[in-house]
Amino acid sequence: IVVIEQKSHLVNGLTVGDNVFVLSGVERRWLLHTQSFRGRLQELEQAVGVDIPCNRQVEELSLFERCMVELLKAWESGARLVLLWNISHFLAGTDIGRLHYAIRHFASRGMAFIYISNSYEELCGLCDRIAVMYNGSVIKVQEMVSGGSEDIHALLQQFTGTTSSPPRSAMSRGSICLNLS
């Protein structure tokens, strides 16, 4: 599991290539085949629409570029699940769109994502399923049928207008909310 959030998990003082390959557990191959890994990074970057030089220092990267390098590192290390934590709090709208493009690219290749956000507009058209949480508990899980905001509006209407706590869902402790098989 990899977490991408405002606090970067990349190592300052190292290059993009060092962070993606050396620190993702393929250091022997990186030392032996530096040139081929630079080509591999360029292929990944082209697939998701970014251009970050392999030899660039991590501390020189923008927040968006750091997110993209962390995503590339997750892919290269074989991570099956990426948790994105309140990305819209620190990325601009155009960068979020570019990140969503990369998420779709990796999701189509088998990587799973949990996207935590307070902005339901941000989730429209990206998520297959939305979970509404209250005080740390999942109270409702909704499949996204139309892929638009009407799915989320319908889900949220169930919980608006009440001054008391939202109702507990039928999900009990121990029931499966997410299956990664």
Where are these regions (language model features)?
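Q-loop/switch helix immediately C-terminal to the Walker
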Residues: 7, 12-26
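Short coil-to-helix "N-cap" segments within the ABC nucleotide-binding domain's helical subdomain
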Residues: 26-46, 63, 93-94, 144-149
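C-terminal boundary and immediately downstream tail of ABC-type ATPase nucleotide-binding domains
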Residues: 43-49, 149-177
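Hydrophobic anchor residue at the start of the ABC signature
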Residues: 67, 71
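Helical segment within the ABC ATPase nucleotide-binding domain
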Residues: 96-109
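H-loop/switch region of ABC-family ATPase nucleotide-binding domains
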Residues: 117-118
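Conserved catalytic segment of ABC-fold P-loop ATPases
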Residues: 125-132
